[in-house]
Amino acid sequence: MSKTYHFIGIKGSGMSALALMLHQMGYKVQGSDVEKYYFTQRGLEQAGIPILPFDEKNITEDVELIAGNAFREDNNVEIAYAIKNGYKFKRYHEFLGHFMNQFTSFGVAGAHGKTSTTGLLSHSMKNITDTSYLIGDGTGRGSANAQYFVFEADEYERHFMPYHPAYSIITNIDFDHPDYFTSIDDVFSAFDDYAKQVQKGLFVYGEDSNLRKITSNAPIYYYGFEENDDFMATDIIRTTTGSNFKVKHDGQIIGEFHVPAYGRHNILNATAVIANLYVAGFDMALVAEHLKTFSGVKRRFTEKIISDTVIIDDFAHHPTEIIATLDAARQKYPSKEIVAIFQPHTFTRTIALLDDFAEALNEADAVYLAQIYGSAREVDHGDVKVEDLAAKINKPAKVVTVENVSPLLDHDNAIYVFMGAGDIQLYERSFEELLASLQTHM
């Protein structure tokens, strides 16, 4: 394969995953990005994929250009050079929509839970049959012989509209991305348009009132916890090692399952995967076998222990996701104090969901807040401050800085849950260094 793909913005989570997948399929891959370290670049470096600085010299006749969605003529020299000199390029989602047509494709969409569900589906399928996949945590796997392709479908700016998958899961519909969507009706409209493009089977959460209204040309299967769902999770036992449950379909139990994951939402994610694979003709015994070994995806309830202290890192940046993450923490650590450290992501989302954020964070035993992380797409007009959120939480909520996370030490028998989509990991790293330094001075 002589073609070289050049990724403009290769460190983006979707872009890095796609680059890895194409590399593993035998294509030549390179990319450019800013110098700042991003967690996705480790996989790229391990694969030997060149990461170059942004430079118009990277744009040559012998490369096919794939551009990250955030990059435009006015903010990127490579895009500007390509447009000026007549080089064509595809956006990530445009390329993917065309590329996936050579496979039987399985999409995962939804306001929340996309990445975890895509991870669970791809893990199960790759252990049963040759499968390529793209996950939103920056993970990708490619095989030149794969018949199946699993991917995460992002609703932001309706990026999923070039996709026409054979099957798709939609985990839920919720109001998010207020910088783009105008209302919940606007969000619903986007998902409804996407659903109409699914070809063989659509799997949606049955207790979501919006998803009950969704329409598709493909058969629609509802999953959930209720008798009127086509696939119902039942006999649920939640323990400190995960969740056990059975799935009922057409009045029959189709299997008993265990997932080493926590929280009600992960039972739903697994039920969606089971329903999809059942309809697609996969052996339920094999599905059950491989669900047991799922180790999770990056930045979704990722745990580490530093100096005997449990630290959880999670991408949760919406009230619904915060509630789910704290529920998972309580399931695994029922006797521990749950300390939440949350960084709001974008000023527009913080303004739109301020009361909901406060209500969600009330589920923690103690709350700390980091300064709002503004998106590159917006300007801080001073309309909201993190102190506004702190004032609405029904317990003292202190604001911490990267330079001083020592207030977190005021807890015994606690686990620390760091949540956010910005640079909350800097706060987490600072806390880890503080714990390590205390250990060395004991």
Curated annotation (Swiss-Prot):
ATP binds at G110, A111, H112, G113, K114, T115, S116. It catalyses: UDP-N-acetyl-alpha-D-muramate + L-alanine + ATP = UDP-N-acetyl-alpha-D-muramoyl-L-alanine + ADP + phosphate + H(+). It comes from the Bacteria. InterPro entries: Mur-like_cat_sf, Mur_ligase_C, Mur_ligase_C_dom_sf, Mur_ligase_cen, Mur_ligase_N, MurCDEF_pg_biosynth, UDP-N-AcMur_Ala_ligase_MurC. Keywords: ATP-binding, Cell cycle, Cell division, Cell shape, Cell wall biogenesis/degradation, Cytoplasm, Ligase, Nucleotide-binding, Peptidoglycan synthesis. Pfam families: Mur_ligase, Mur_ligase_C, Mur_ligase_M. One of its GO terms (cellular component) is cytoplasm. The keyword Cell wall biogenesis/degradation applies. Pathway: Cell wall biogenesis; peptidoglycan biosynthesis. It is an enzyme of class 6 (ligase). Its EC number is 6.3.2.8. Disulfide bonds: none annotated. GO terms for molecular function: ATP binding; UDP-N-acetylmuramate-L-alanine ligase activity. Its main location: cytoplasm. One of its GO terms (biological process) is peptidoglycan biosynthetic process. It is found in: Cytoplasm. Gene3D superfamilies: Mur ligase, C-terminal domain, Mur-like, catalytic domain, NAD(P)-binding Rossmann-like Domain. Signal peptide: none annotated. Belongs to the MurCDEF family. Cell wall formation. NCBIfam families: murC. This is UDP-N-acetylmuramate--L-alanine ligase. It comes from Streptococcus thermophilus (strain ATCC BAA-491 / LMD-9).
